[in-house]
Amino acid sequence: MKTITLNNHNYELIENYKNAYDDQEVQNRFTDYFEPYDYVVGDIAYSSLRLKGFYDTKNKKAKKINDYKNLEEYLKTNCAVDCKYFVLKKID
């Protein structure tokens, strides 16, 4: 898997459905808001990238809305049908 550095943190690209990951696009959208999250998911609809942070289930900050175990539900209910998406996992 590919390792990516964003705001001095390392992430591993663990899923890249339909080749959704675009380094330049992510660099432009990623802010310090996403730094506390264990995972960052990007989905593309109408040619626009949207990012959302998720916590690992073991993280005390995890709630139903941002628990990584609910990723499939998020993709089905909040994203365009069969949209391109990627998942970054924080590794440091």
Q: What would you call each of these model-derived segments?
A:
Residues 35, 42-59:
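N-terminal interaction modules that seed assembly of large macromolecular complexes
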Residues 8-17, 59-62, 85, 91-92:
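Compositionally biased, intrinsically disordered or flexible polar/acidic segments
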Residues 12, 40-41, 50-52, 84-89:
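Ordered hydrophobic segments in well-structured contexts
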Residues 63-92:
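Helix-rich interaction surfaces within compact, conserved domain-sized segments
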Residues 20, 24, 61-66:
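Ordered, soluble secondary-structure elements with a strong preference for glycine-centered loop motifs
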Residues 1-45:
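N-terminal leader/targeting segments and the first structural element of proteins
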